[in-house]
């Protein structure tokens, strides 16, 4: 009944709840003699932590990570690496009204049916609070990728759509992504998104989002055919993130609007090396990397914790209504950007250790 771990060689297990004393993870399979301290992990956690802008939850968590094991004198020992972050800003009183009610769109009902008990405070184990530890594991994964692949591998996540408003790809600027609260590559979309989120928040609602992850520098040949395809493993990793309802590679779903002529990635030779004339398949063919940029996207549904009253039932199977109080993201997709990067990084690191 447990499924709190992911990965084969690079494997990590997360633990902890939203309003518990702490959250943490144990990362196994990390080779020895890799430089690693808290300073290597903290910058990635700072990207994800809550309370950084008016467009995310106002819960204040410093998310200061502590390494408990698996390193000695600033280097990995080859043994399990234990990480911990202490929760600091729980407000469990906000959830008293939903103790016996199921929030529509949340895991409240399904956890109750499966386990016969649930931590109603902030969603407990099903809360996105857990994703901080995924980001920590992702930071370690990046160190492994750097150690295993000679080329510089760059993993870049960006928010490309909120609600009905999508970026203009012609405006894509990697340098702008870390300079705004949305991780947007398009400067022109910011004001539109700000207005949309404010409108949704004032109406007691929320918005969904799409995040794109790009990986440059991967060699051709990474991944295994059929049941261990690198794209299927990435899809599994991304689908495991809270509120994610869809994943695609390359043109993905929009491929249905193409033909075999327009969607195929033709090839030539340049400087005695293979050259692809397009990248409609997102850098993966047959589950194996082509050496092109790997491109994947995932869809995050609108936050289910909203102020607007909704119909639901309670633990006595009686009909009732619910209005969720507390501090919640009006668009949870914003903080999902570094989480998506981390899950792609952990998948690539696992494949590097398995097949390189």
Predicted ranges, named:
Residues 11-16, 119-130, 220-224, 279-284, ...:
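A short glycine/serine-rich beta->alpha loop
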Residues 99-125, 310-330:
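Short acidic, glycine/tyrosine-flanked loop/strand segments centered on an H-E-D-like triad
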Residues 113-226:
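Glycine-rich, mobile lid/loop segments that gate access to catalytic sites or pores
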Residues 18-21, 204-207, 211-319:
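Glycine-rich anion/phosphate-binding loop at the beta-strand->alpha-helix junction
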Residues 45-104, 108:
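Glycine-rich, N-terminal phosphate-binding loop and its surrounding beta-alpha-beta segment
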Residues 11, 303-356:
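Internal helix-turn-beta structural module
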Residues 21-33, 129-153, 228-236, 292-294, ...:
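Alpha-helical support elements that line or immediately flank enzyme active sites
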């Amino acid at each position: 009944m447990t499924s709190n771990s992911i990965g084969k060689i690079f494997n990590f297990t997360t633990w902890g709840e939203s309003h518990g004393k702490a959250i943490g993870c144990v990362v196994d399979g990390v080779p020895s003699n890799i430089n690693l301290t808290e300073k290597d992990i903290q910058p990635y956690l700072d990207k994800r932590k809550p309370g950084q802008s008016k467009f995310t939850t106002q819960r204040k968590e410093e998310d200061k990570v502590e390494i408990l094991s698996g390193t000695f004198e600033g280097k990995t020992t080859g043994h399990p690496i234990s990480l911990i972050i202490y929760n600091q800003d729980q407000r469990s009183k906000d959830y008293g009204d939903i103790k016996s009610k199921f929030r529509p769109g949340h895991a409240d009902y399904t956890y109750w049916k499966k386990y016969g008990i649930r931590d109603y405070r902030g969603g407990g184990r099903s809360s996105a609070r857990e994703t901080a530890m995924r980001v920590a594991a992702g930071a370690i994964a990046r160190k492994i990728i750097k150690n295993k692949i000679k080329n510089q591998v760059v993993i870049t996540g960006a928010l490309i759509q909120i609600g009905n408003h999508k970026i203009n790809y012609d405006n894509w600027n990697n340098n702008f992504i870390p300079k705004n609260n949305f991780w947007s590559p398009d400067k022109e979309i910011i004001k539109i998104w700000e207005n949309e989120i404010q409108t949704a928040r004032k109406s007691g609602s929320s918005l969904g989002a799409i995040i794109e992850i790009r990986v440059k520098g991967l060699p051709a040949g990474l991944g295994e055919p059929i049941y261990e395809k690198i794209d299927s493993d990435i899809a599994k990793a991304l689908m495991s993130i809270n509120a994610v309802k869809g994943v695609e590679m390359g043109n993905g779903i929009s491929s249905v609007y193409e033909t075999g002529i327009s969607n195929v990635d033709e090839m030539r030779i340049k400087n005695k090396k293979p050259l692809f004339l397009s990248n409609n398949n997102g850098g993966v063919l047959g589950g194996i990397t082509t050496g092109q940029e790997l491109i994947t996207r995932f869809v995050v549904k609108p936050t289910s914790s909203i102020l607007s009253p909704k119909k639901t039932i309670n633990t006595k199977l009686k009909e009732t209504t619910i209005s969720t109080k507390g501090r919640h993201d009006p668009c949870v997709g914003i903080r999902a950007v570094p989480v998506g990067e981390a899950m792609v990084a952990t998948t690539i690191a696992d494949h590097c250790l398995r097949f390189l």
